[in-house]
Amino acid sequence: MASAPAEAETRQRLLRTVKKEVKQIMEEAVTRKFVHEDSSHIISFCAAVEACVLHGLRRRAAGFLRSNKIAALFMKVGKNFPPAEDLSRKVQDLEQLIESARNQIQGLQENVRKLPKLPNLSPLAIKHLWIRTALFEKVLDKIVHYLVENSSKYYEKEALLMDPVDGPILASLLVGPCALEYTKMKTADHFWTDPSADELVQRHRIHSSHVRQDSPTKRPALCIQKRHSSGSMDDRPSLSARDYVESLHQNSRATLLYGKNNVLVQPRDDMEAVPGYLSLHQTADVMTLKWTPNQLMNGSVGDLDYEKSVYWDYAMTIRLEEIVYLHCHQQVDSGGTVVLVSQDGIQRPPFRFPKGGHLLQFLSCLENGLLPHGQLDPPLWSQRGKGKVFPKLRKRSPQGSAESTSSDKDDDEATDYVFRIIYPGMQSEFVAPDFLGSTSSVSVGPAWMMVPAGRSMLVVARGSQWEPARWDTTLPTPSPKEQPPMPQDLMDVSVSNLPSLWQPSPRKSSCSSCSQSGSADGSSTNGCNHERAPLKLLCDNMKYQILSRAFYGWLAYCRHLSTVRTHLSALVNHMIVSPDLPCDAGQGLTARIWEQYLHDSTSYEEQELLRLIYYGGIQPEIRKAVWPFLLGHYQFGMTETERKEVDEQIHACYAQTMAEWLGCEAIVRQRERESHAAALAKCSSGASLDSHLHRMLHRDSTISNESSQSCSSGRQNIRLHSDSSSSTQVFESVDEVEQVEAEGRLEEKQPKIPNGNLVNGTCSPDSGHPSSHNFSSGLSEHSEPSLSTEDSVLDAQRNTPTVLRPRDGSVDDRQSSEATTSQDEAPREELAVQDSLESDLLANESMDEFMSITGSLDMALPEKDDVVMEGWRSSETEKHGQADSEDNLSEEPEMESLFPALASLAVTTSANEVSPVSSSGVTYSPELLDLYTVNLHRIEKDVQRCDRNYWYFTPANLEKLRNIMCSYIWQHIEIGYVQGMCDLLAPLLVILDDEALAFSCFTELMKRMNQNFPHGGAMDTHFANMRSLIQILDSELFELMHQNGDYTHFYFCYRWFLLDFKRELVYDDVFLVWETIWAAKHVSSAHYVLFIALALVEVYRDIILENNMDFTDIIKFFNEMAERHNTKQVLKLARDLVYKVQTLIENK
């Protein structure tokens, strides 16, 4: 009897094993979100738990004669514990089902297919069936806990479950695995090979080249007159091309044991050897050898269907359970050849391995894969230092005469071998068929006996009926003289003792009633005894079936046309525009055609230009000139003078809009600074504000790094700096303060604009904000203001607009914003109180005074517009001189701007409402300020992450993007900014490269796109139309989507419709798709985006169908495929789909 320490060590070892297996299962559950029933971790876990439960089990509890001790134990526990009783009943039913199916399969019964679906269990799973089922039924922890509580009844004193500590620990360890959900779904291998979109496309590209279906008259794949016989391989791989390609990849169901490329096979005698990929795969049930030509693996087959089909004919799939012999021929100058011989005597084409020991490596992998149930006979030898080597055996002829070979030859000498695949645990005797009508028994001789060349001995199971006509074409019937002598050690064995893998399936009768009433031993009669059905009845049945199919096809077509008329007629223009009339539109709109049109607008009609764009796109060099026409900024037929007038109006409108939101933004920034200052003031307890500010000045605060504002007049400079000092500069670093002092000294040398230049100057100079009236005087006297943000850029981090300075004698915008005077010595407390009083006073100004201000400003606008336009046109020539400011911007961009603040519009809702006042005297309601603040933060966040990897979006151009977006949102504040709007603006800005022009075109574009955002209702309409299109044009795909859930919501299309496919394509493709969409409105369909979306789905429809994708899978697939689509192919297919719908409507 083992000592106590040894028993304790055994218990700890068993417990550690269970802990390790539990940890692996729980990690798998967390990592993969599920645990599959066939997971190897479950097998290991069941084995570990079973070892613990059986440790120290009493013989009486296990049963004296029972081989399955776990079953005996659980059945005894079931007498007193209901969960164990239920488990016993379920497992016994399952065992009975498995045993019954196994017996019927061994008996070769025809009605085996009528059995209930047998669970696909591996031998190890069957071995641990009781523990495994208890785990899946979530009662294992309860049963073990019961055993722990009643351990004295079932276990010896040294047992693990008898231990007062280890026993409860084991029971508690099982609670976690029993709480998990286990699945049988196909997603079992997603952890192994959850294929990416790349791999799915590649697999589809390989097997999609197989387009021709098998036909009865096609040439056999290997040019061997091979007939269907028991145990033989099909003429072609039984799997479809897709399944064949899928099986080449590693997954949890099939393990790749061996793979080698450039293995030569000669499919036909009249052709050269073809290189291909040889792979050995093992599943729980079968081992398979596959060979695929390199042309299919590389996707390099020709475009001809015949060529594609021929290569698929060459591909081979061989089940090794059908192979008996492996003939290995070694050549000194090559790597060796393997010839496989199957049970029915058919010799497979030789596999020629390249040099380098690949033949031996293949045999080694094959032998390892056969274990533990099978092996090679003779086995490979293991040699120290070399690993597996060929065996050194004396070969004999079939008659037993020894050949002149010795076992001590040099290892490098080329030697031929014949290996047999055997299963040691089973008797492998066969019965030879009697070709002349008599039955003789024969056993297979020694494995290393050579079979004479040109002859294969056929061994089959007794009890099977063979069709003589088939054998006549396969093997010549030997005469009695030619028959090989039978070995003496004949044995007559029962067919039930044969290995199940080698038992041939009997020939099936063509009569269903005969096949159902087949004999129990699998034999059947040579023909059908029933009377033949009259030929007329057969013809009548065929006629009725043809008529029925034609009628239901016609009925389905009528229903489809009804759906087309109801749902799809409004999606397309009914007039079909040809791509070839009056000329081929494949080249699109070229620069030559466009120049001719601009010179003479009557040379081309608008519809003809749109037709060219729809079928061929726009030449990239002229997109900047053509896009404003497509988007409605210009009208086709406008003269150059008319276009200039439109540009001037747009520039003036854009400048005025910018001035409005810049004034509002100034107040927003000021409010934020004041709120920060107020929060800091509350933090000071007992100390004076001065001392507190003094301390804060020396902190490198990151709360805000906004610059203070200044005004052009001397007094406003003083007041503004005082305000800024009391509210903003407490957040600035010491370096910034020093910079402010230096810039203030520089500004003292600059000319100041007197207060007398104010236009109808009723604005309080003490408001603490710059006045737009000062801007007006500056623009009148100095005619070089620039609207280009190349000069001063609004950035998302520094958002304080400042006063525009005259160009001649002006200072840097940072200097103007930070300017101060040395006479600013007023105490900050007094200034803060005074500003508060002035703000209250200004808030109560009457509406009449406000209207008088804006009325005067409107009168001055025409004078300013000329100046504004001159400054805008000069911005392009000035931008090259701003290199220094752009460099500074890239490091720490400022938020000040040199845009002219023109007259602002009245935006307040009530004269008596307390509202902040801008520098121009315009009042803003608190609701408006809050709304703009929210949108401003959203815009800044999106602008900073808009296509950062695209070359165009430098910090300066991002500022242009921000300016345009803020201007648009200011005009549509009731809608506000929604994520994605920047994506729609970005391509316009890239092409047009002009703020005002891009602003106008974006406004036109948003008239259509606004409805796709949440505040519109177009998205649901798109989904419904998409559903109708797929239902009509691709019923198979529609059925899949109907099967996989809520098919009425095509959410995977949401981003496509929201952004016009902007995130699905690269920029060059976005340009092409967008201009096609805009032209399609007038040529084919105002809903062309639907057909592009359908085309995208159709391009990958086979992949979607093959992988049975649900909406989550489709979204994931298209996200991974973003910016990698063949856009020209998609657009061509979209045009074809439009034409198809137009034709359906036309023929209704």
Curated annotation (Swiss-Prot):
Polar residues: compositionally biased ranges: 702-716, 757-802
Alphabetized UniProt keyword annotations: Cytoplasm, Cytoplasmic vesicle, Golgi apparatus, GTPase activation, Membrane
SMART domains given in the database record: RUN, TBC
Segments of skewed composition (Basic residues): 385-397
Protein's gene: SGSM1
Compartments, record wording: Golgi apparatus, trans-Golgi network; Cytoplasmic vesicle membrane; Cytoplasm
Chain positions covered by the region annotation Important for interaction with RAB9A and RAB9B: 256-297
Functional description taken from the UniProt entry: Interacts with numerous Rab family members, functioning as Rab effector for some, and as GTPase activator for others. Promotes GTP hydrolysis by RAB34 and RAB36. Probably functions as a GTPase effector with RAB9A and RAB9B; does not stimulate GTP hydrolysis with RAB9A and RAB9B.
Protein name from the UniProt record: Small G protein signaling modulator 1
